Every structure is written in C-alpha cells, then in structure tokens.
C-alpha cells in the first residue's frame, strides 16, 4: 500500500512561488496531484478497514454466544461457600442446644464437685 505524503499541517502550510499572472501552474498541479494520491490512499484504507469490520462482525455472529451469567449447573463457588458456611453455623447452633438439653444437668452436677 502506498504511504500518505501530506499531513493536514503540510497542506495548510504549503506555499507556491508567484509568477506574473499568479501562482506557478506547474507547482500547483504537482501539489494537487500529490493531494489526490493521498485521498486515493485514504479511500483505499477506509475501504479495507470497512471490509475488515464487516468480516469481524460476520465472524462474531458465527461464534456461539457465551452468557455472562453463570449457568445453573455450575453455581458460583462464593455463593456455595457462603450457603454451606451458614448451614454449618446453623448445624453447630442446633448441636449446641441439643448438648445443653442432654448434657446440661450432667455439666451442672459436675460443677458442684
């Protein structure tokens, strides 16, 4: 691919030599030829980028969609840990109550000794 010759600053700062009847026609024509080449390069570049975008969009539509939400068959490990720790805590509380009911009198009797 051809390279771009002028920047916007180059075009803005371009000066032409003066002749009796105005600017040098040859200089202006050469400059405009180069500007035209730049515009053709830009057009080619834009066309290739648009084609690349279209190709990427098509490729994206062909790929299966991946959901960002976790699937029900694979629960979130943090949720599982939190719910199991709550379950363990509840079990420990119940076990403590049962021990107090069953062994409470024995514990009180042993403290009197």
UniProtKB/Swiss-Prot annotation:
GO biological process, alphabetically ordered: cell division; regulation of cell shape
Family of the protein in this entry: Belongs to the GpsB family.
Protein name in the entry: Cell cycle protein GpsB
Oligomeric and partner information: Forms polymers through the coiled coil domains. Interacts with PBP1, MreC and EzrA.
Keyword set includes Cell cycle: yes
Coiled coil: 37-63
Job description of the protein: Divisome component that associates with the complex late in its assembly, after the Z-ring is formed, and is dependent on DivIC and PBP2B for its recruitment to the divisome. Together with EzrA, is a key component of the system that regulates PBP1 localization during cell cycle progression. Its main role could be the removal of PBP1 from the cell pole after pole maturation is completed. Also contributes to the recruitment of PBP1 to the division complex. Not essential for septum formation.
Subcellular location per the Swiss-Prot or TrEMBL entry: Cytoplasm
